[in-house]
């Protein structure tokens, strides 16, 4: 690909020459040290990358992160605060279990849970 960059037998590149060429092109590559895990949070789950190797490449002022490791997806569980359950119970006169279920079904939306229980 690059003239004069062939390694032994025309395969691969000399790492020192590669680094020099990248520097000339304005590309800086650094490894982020001592990374234990990387967590990417989405609306539905967390993607956890353990034993992560993170490389940061800077090109023309823009940083790109490359992450390699053991990936697992962890679904988010909806945490319903006790105060919300109590409020739904007071407003609708239902049991704690019914209030909790209504809040789970409404993704924690108090008004939606109360309306659903009131119209049932």
From Swiss-Prot:
Gene Ontology molecular-function annotations? RNA binding
Keyword Cytoplasm annotated? no
> Cell division among the record's keywords?
no
Q: Which Gene3D superfamilies match?
A: DNA helicase RuvA subunit, C-terminal domain, Nascent polypeptide-associated complex domain
Could you list the residue ranges forming a coiled coil in this record? none
- Matching Pfam families, A to Z? NAC, UBA_HYPK
**Protein's GO biological process:** protein transport
Annotated function? Contacts the emerging nascent chain on the ribosome.
The family note in this entry says: Belongs to the NAC-alpha family.
Q: What protein does this entry describe?
A: Nascent polypeptide-associated complex protein
Source organism per entry reads Methanosarcina mazei (strain ATCC BAA-159 / DSM 3647 / Goe1 / Go1 / JCM 11833 / OCM 88)
Taxonomic classification, please? Archaea, Methanobacteriati, Methanobacteriota, Stenosarchaea group, Methanomicrobia
This protein's encoding gene = nac
